């Protein structure tokens, strides 16, 4: 397991311990607002919004909260004006990090992200400093306990997915960005349960971390970024051998 998929497995183990419902709701509401603003308020014609609503329902968000977020995104209700921002930087060990945020105050978010990088031994860089190490992809998570690797590979090929990366916690499917929602919905028609679907950045290659101290620092930095209210995704191009991961886990 490497890169994005590696971090996904670590995050899922952490999520079992940490259920921060209020923080999750805040992130989901922002995604609904932005999806509505970019693609309109009708989920039938806006697959990103449709997916955001599904995620909110899975998290047991009350319908009135979902409806209010859609109305804010459509300009029918007053509220914060959110924009999507991408930050780039380095974690310890030369690990490249991409941070995708949704914010109503770019200066505040930039300050918070920079503080986390600095505090944990990394550094926030200029736009373009690491993005060339990643490629934009559609990203789908499937719970590993519900679908076997063999079954998923067969169905992923059938619906035109680009790549499947099996894992202990989740299997990850990558697609061409423009085909993400089509692949997701075709998988669902074949009975595959989808835990998450989003546009993301996939590492082109990975940095191997071979010492426990650096591994611990990288994971602490990524966790701290994930916990910022404005941050929606954190992607990094690292790989940690299983024996070291068990020690720092």
UniProtKB/Swiss-Prot annotation:
SUPFAM superfamilies per UniProt: YebC-like (SSF75625)
Keyword annotations from UniProtKB, A to Z: Cytoplasm, DNA-binding, Transcription, Transcription regulation
Stated name of the protein: Probable transcriptional regulatory protein aq_1575
A GO MF term: DNA binding
GO-annotated cellular components: cytosol
UniProt record similarity statement: Belongs to the TACO1 family.
InterPro entries: Integrase-like_N (IPR017856), TACO1_YebC-like_2nd/3rd_dom (IPR048300), TACO1_YebC_N (IPR049083), Transcrip_reg_TACO1-like (IPR002876), Transcrip_reg_TACO1-like_dom3 (IPR026564), YebC-like (IPR029072)
Natural source organism: Aquifex aeolicus (strain VF5)
Compartments it resides in: Cytoplasm
BP terms from Gene Ontology: regulation of DNA-templated transcription
């Amino acid at each position: 397991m490497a890169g994005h998929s590696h971090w996904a497995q670590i995050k899922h183990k952490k999520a079992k311990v940490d259920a921060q419902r209020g923080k999750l709701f805040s992130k989901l509401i922002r995604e609904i607002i932005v999806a509505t603003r970019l693609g309109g308020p009708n989920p039938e014609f806006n697959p990103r919004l449709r997916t955001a609503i599904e995620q909110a329902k899975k998290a047991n968000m009350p319908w009135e909260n979902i409806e209010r977020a859609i109305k804010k995104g459509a300009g029918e209700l007053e509220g914060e004006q959110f924009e999507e921002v991408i930050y780039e930087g380095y974690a310890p060990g030369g690990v490249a990090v991409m941070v995708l945020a949704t914010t109503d105050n770019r200066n505040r978010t930039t300050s918070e992200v920079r503080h986390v990088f600095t505090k944990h031994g990394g550094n926030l860089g200029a736009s373009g400093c690491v993005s060339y190490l990643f490629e934009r992809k559609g990203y789908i998570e499937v719970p590993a306990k519900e679908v076997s690797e063999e079954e998923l590979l067969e169905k992923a090929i059938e619906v035109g997915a680009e790549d499947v990366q099996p894992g202990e916690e989740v299997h990850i499917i990558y697609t061409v960005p423009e085909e993400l929602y089509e692949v997701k919905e075709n998988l669902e028609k074949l009975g595959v349960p989808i835990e998450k679907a989003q546009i993301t950045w996939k590492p082109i290659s990975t940095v191997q971390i071979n010492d426990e101290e650096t591994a611990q620092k990288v994971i602490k930095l990524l966790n701290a970024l994930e916990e910022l209210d404005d941050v929606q995704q954190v992607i990094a191009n690292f790989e940690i051998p299983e024996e070291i991961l068990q020690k720092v886990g």
